[in-house]
């Protein structure tokens, strides 16, 4: 959430910055509400003061033996008027709060202009796509040939956009999780944590999924307003909700593996084949909490940590900075890492790394105590995929496929596969 003060002091400037996203701020309505709020607030303060004055007069009149009935009537009338004014003020403030809750974060100055993913800007490339001397199969056919991927059975069990993995392919999937967690905790300084896969509405509000993106979530049929997590970002980031930590504890870095659940409500007809877009998938998430002046540098290191995984796996990829129209609701700046998929002859997203500034922290009241001033200040939050497990498996199935239908196992994963170097059809 943006600082509400900005809507009172810098409304035109905020509207101009949000336009970079293609977001139109209703400046006229906000100004109307703010003007009304000021008037009604003054009215409430005046009525409160008048009521207090009249209440004191009652005591004096009573002590002097005077008739206090007229004064009592005046106080009752003032109470009624004050109650009515307070209700009006509450309604105005509630509408303002609702509008502000639906306003996305302001973008960093360096975020490029653009409407959608076609306007994202490539920053760098790593690795050279492999040249095949045989006809390349996609991951669905490679996995089927290894008897390790079964979408038909998953469809019978649940429905579309689910997968069953078996045998060596399932072990390879597990190996990726272990490899990523070991790398991030052993080399990058993250603490591994385990969190609930079900969260409440407050948590989803804190990280920005609610109220605007409820249709993307799986809500449980329960009177407690529980949801399946769309990403570990939600429970991990909310660990700091309503907390004030000491400055000396910063930076805080968490690595967490969870399944993720998404309705893909806006993705009808897209990536219907295979594992690219699933309702349930695994991810290793990286979350950081830092001091405000350090978040942009932290974003660069966070992206580097995700890149390390791709480099160790020798998977060609590129890094792009998202344009204004493609940057997520809560983010001020986002990099995507896109891995090379030979069957599609293109790069596909495998990690998204974002700096949220104090946007999430303000919603969550996540703060640290400034060692110099002794006062609490808002943290800056960041997160990124390190990496999406399913899409990494897809990339390995395609980039490491062999002419005879077997699959070479990346060297860094072999220790997690009991030294196995390849997978062949059983």
Swiss-Prot record:
Pfam families: Seryl_tRNA_N, tRNA-synt_2b. ATP binds at residues 262-264, 349-352. SUPFAM superfamilies: Class II aaRS and biotin synthetases, tRNA-binding arm. It is an enzyme of class 6 (ligase). L-serine binds at residues 231-233, 285, 385. Keywords: Aminoacyl-tRNA synthetase, ATP-binding, Cytoplasm, Ligase, Nucleotide-binding, Protein biosynthesis. It catalyses: tRNA(Ser) + L-serine + ATP = L-seryl-tRNA(Ser) + AMP + diphosphate + H(+); tRNA(Sec) + L-serine + ATP = L-seryl-tRNA(Sec) + AMP + diphosphate + H(+). Catalyzes the attachment of serine to tRNA(Ser). Is also able to aminoacylate tRNA(Sec) with serine, to form the misacylated tRNA L-seryl-tRNA(Sec), which will be further converted into selenocysteinyl-tRNA(Sec). Homodimer. The tRNA molecule binds across the dimer. Belongs to the class-II aminoacyl-tRNA synthetase family. Type-1 seryl-tRNA synthetase subfamily. Consists of two distinct domains, a catalytic core and a N-terminal extension that is involved in tRNA binding. This is Serine--tRNA ligase.
């Amino acid at each position: 959430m943006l600082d509400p003060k900005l809507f009172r002091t810098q409304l035109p400037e905020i509207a101009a910055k949000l336009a970079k996203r293609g977001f139109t701020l209703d400046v006229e309505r906000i100004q109307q509400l703010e003007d009304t709020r000021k008037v009604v607030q003054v009215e409430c303060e005046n009525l409160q003061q008048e009521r207090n004055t009249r209440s004191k007069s009652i005591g004096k009149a009573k002590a002097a033996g005077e008739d206090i009935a007229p004064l009592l009537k005046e106080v009752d009338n003032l109470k009624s008027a004050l109650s009515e004014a307070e209700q009006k003020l509450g309604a105005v403030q509630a509408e303002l709060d609702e509008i502000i809750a639906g306003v996305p974060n302001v973008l960093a100055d360096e975020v490029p202009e653009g409407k959608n993913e076609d306007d994202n800007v490539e920053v760098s490339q790593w690795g050279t796509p492999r040249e095949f001397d045989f006809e390349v199969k996609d991951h669905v056919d490679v996995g089927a040939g290894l008897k390790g991927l079964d979408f038909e059975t998953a469809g019978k069990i649940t429905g579309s956009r689910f997968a069953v993995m078996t045998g060596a392919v399932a072990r390879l999937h597990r190996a990726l999780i272990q490899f990523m967690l070991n790398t991030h905790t052993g080399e990058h300084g993250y603490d591994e944590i385990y969190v609930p896969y079900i969260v409440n509405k407050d948590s989803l509000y804190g990280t920005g999924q609610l109220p605007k993106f409820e249709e993307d979530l799986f809500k449980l049929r329960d009177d407690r307003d529980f949801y399946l997590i769309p990403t570990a970002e939600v429970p991990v980031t909310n660990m700091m909700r309503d907390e004030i930590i000491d400055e000396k504890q910063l930076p805080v870095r968490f690595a967490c593996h969870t399944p993720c659940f998404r309705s893909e409500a806006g993705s009808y007809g897209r990536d219907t084949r295979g594992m690219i877009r699933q309702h349930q998938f695994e991810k290793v998430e990286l979350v950081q909490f830092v001091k405000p002046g350090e978040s942009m540098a932290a974003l660069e290191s966070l992206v580097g940590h995700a890149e390390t995984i791709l480099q160790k796996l020798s998977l060609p990829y590129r890094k792009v900075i998202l344009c204004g129209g493609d940057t997520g609701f809560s983010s001020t700046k986002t990099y995507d890492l896109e891995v090379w998929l030979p069957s599609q002859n293109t790069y596909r997203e495998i990690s998204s790394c974002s700096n949220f500034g104090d946007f999430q922290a303000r919603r969550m009241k996540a703060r640290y105590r400034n060692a110099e001033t002794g006062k609490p200040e808002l943290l800056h939050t960041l997160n990124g995929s390190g990496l999406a497990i399913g899409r990494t498996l897809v990339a390995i199935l395609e980039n490491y496929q062999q002419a005879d239908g077997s699959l070479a196992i990346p060297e860094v994963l072999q220790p997690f596969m009991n030294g196995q170097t390849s997978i062949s059809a059983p």
